[in-house]
A protein has these predicted regions:
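Conserved catalytic-core segments centered on acid/base and nucleophilic motifs
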Residues: 101-106, 157, 167-169
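Outer-membrane beta-barrel channel domains
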Residues: 1, 6-129, 181, 185-189, ...
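Low-complexity, polar/charged sequence tracts that form flexible coils or short amphipathic helices
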Residues: 61, 147-150, 158-160, 172-176, ...
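A short, charged
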Residues: 105-108, 141-145
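Flexible, membrane-facing loop/turn or short amphipathic-helix motifs
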Residues: 143-147, 205-208
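Transmembrane beta-strand segments of Gram-negative outer membrane beta-barrel proteins
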Residues: 125-144, 165-167
Length: 219
């Protein structure tokens, strides 16, 4: 292990990874940057398989001890029994394909209730209640011709909300540069899924002139 190799420390209580050394910043909000320093970030590999990726949360009401069957594109993807009253299913396995989920509640007397839950995804979407973050304090690790040691910080946050929405944001900062990004993503069902974000950046050049700009990204 050399001085600059990445040294990961797994923090299972936080489901996060602390990295010291050479690594890369996450690419979900800003472009990924090579760095030499310290980063604390959520680690999806510490989650159960049923909690990885995006899947909608299913809400329903059972009148009795009932069997709940969930299908997508004609295939059964989950089946379980629930007690009488309101229920929530938030641990569906993520699927690669889009397509509304068909929910069937079969009561103990044989009566059946059916309804659909929209499902479509873009990479930024998170499950309801999922909070994903990263914080970096480091030096930019460029190519061998780089002469100046450019120190920077970055922080990002992605939060899964009810009804298929996700909000996210982040900031980057260095001596003569600031950037702020804010965005949202949504599972729109038959209309598909979309994410849109706006980044505002400001920089100061060597002659002390200030420049700023905006960029918008749609996915």
């Amino acid at each position: 292990l050399s001085l600059h190799d990445a040294l990961p420390i797994y923090l299972r209580a936080l489901k996060s990874e602390l990295t010291a050394g050479d690594s890369y910043t996450p690419s979900a909000i800003f472009d990924s940057l090579p760095f030499r320093g310290i980063q604390l970030a959520s680690d999806d590999n510490m989650l159960p398989d049923s909690m990885k990726g995006f899947a909608p949360t299913i809400h329903g009401i059972a009148k009795s001890n009932a069997q709940v069957t969930i299908r997508q594109n004609g295939y059964t993807i989950d089946q379980r029994y629930v007690s009488p009253g309101a229920f929530t299913i938030d641990d569906l396995y993520s699927t690669a394909s889009s397509g509304d989920l068909s929910v069937e509640i079969k009561e103990s007397d044989g009566s059946i209730t059916r309804y659909s839950v929209p499902y479509s995804a873009v990479p930024i979407l998170q499950r309801e209640g999922r909070l994903k973050y990263a914080a970096t304090a480091a030096s930019y690790r460029g190519d061998s011709s780089q002469k100046e040691d450019v120190k920077f910080g970055q922080a990002t946050l992605i939060w899964g909300l009810p009804h298929g929405f996700t909000v996210y944001g982040g900031t980057q900062f260095a001596d003569h540069y600031r950037a702020l990004a804010l965005g949202t993503g949504a599972n729109l069902g038959d209309w598909g899924a979309i994410s849109v974000d706006l980044t505002q950046a400001r920089s100061t050049l060597a002659d002390d002139s200030e420049h700023q700009g905006q960029s918008t990204r749609f996915l």
